[in-house]
């Protein structure tokens, strides 16, 4: 649990159909029911903080909003790299491409699991995503 940024939730090449984002969102909701709000959070980055439940709510809401925007973007078929703008405010350079692609696919796989999107491979094996 980090006070300002969100964890990188990514799909890795070894499990291309995984849905780690849904699992992560469910774990955040579970933490809210099991850990008191006034607990002192000791994050791996930045300073300790209180207000766990508000932070959990902010994280869940933020990712749900990104999922909704991504769904809107999929009116026309897109590749995972084509929806970076929905997730990231800054340009994704070569040094962040693998991590950004993994996070993009995590959001796309979540939409697929919710029956809101589909993935189709073209003749070259490139995955294209569109609304279901």
How would you label these PLM feature ranges?
Residues 69-132:
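C-terminal regulatory/interaction regions
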């Amino acid at each position: 649990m980090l006070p300002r940024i969100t964890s990188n939730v990514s799909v890795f090449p070894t499990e291309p159909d995984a849905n780690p984002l849904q699992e992560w969102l469910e774990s955040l909701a579970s933490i809210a029911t099991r850990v008191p709000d006034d607990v002192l959070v000791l994050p791996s980055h930045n300073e300790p903080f209180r207000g766990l439940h508000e932070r959990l709510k902010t994280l869940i809401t933020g990712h749900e909003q990104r999922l909704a925007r991504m769904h809107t973007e999929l009116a026309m078929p897109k590749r995972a790299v084509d929806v970076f703008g929905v997730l990231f405010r800054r340009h994704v350079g070569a040094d962040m491409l693998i991590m950004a692609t993994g996070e993009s696919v995590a959001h796309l796989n979540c939409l697929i699991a919710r029956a809101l999107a589909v993935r189709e491979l073209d003749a070259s094996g490139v995955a294209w995503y569109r609304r279901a």
